UniProtKB/Swiss-Prot annotation:
Belongs to the Tlp family. The gene is tlp. It comes from the Bacteria. It comes from Clostridium botulinum (strain Langeland / NCTC 10281 / Type F). Residues 53-75 are annotated as: Disordered. This is Protein Tlp homolog.
């Protein structure tokens, strides 16, 4: 069986797409938090957004790494 080559050409685009979607989800959750009176729902959404923001930090670091590697020719 032949291994697939490491094709990383579109990694930056994929990561950027995930960042955009995560930000949209945070914004939607913030809207729901503002509209709901259910404290349990608010707490759950706040916790999810905290995890999303942590994930965003990681994705931003990853995109920097990928952009640097792309510039250096994926060595």
């Amino acid at each position: 069986m032949k291994n697939k080559p490491d094709d990383r050409k579109d990694n930056v685009d994929k990561i950027q797409y995930n960042i955009t979607k995560t930000i949209q989800n945070c914004e939607l959750a913030d809207e729901m938090i503002a509209k709901t009176d259910d404290e349990k729902t608010k707490k759950t959404l706040i916790e999810k957004n905290e995890r999303r923001r942590e994930a965003l930090d990681g994705m931003r670091e990853e995109i920097k790494d990928e952009a640097r590697d792309k510039k250096n020719g994926y060595m």
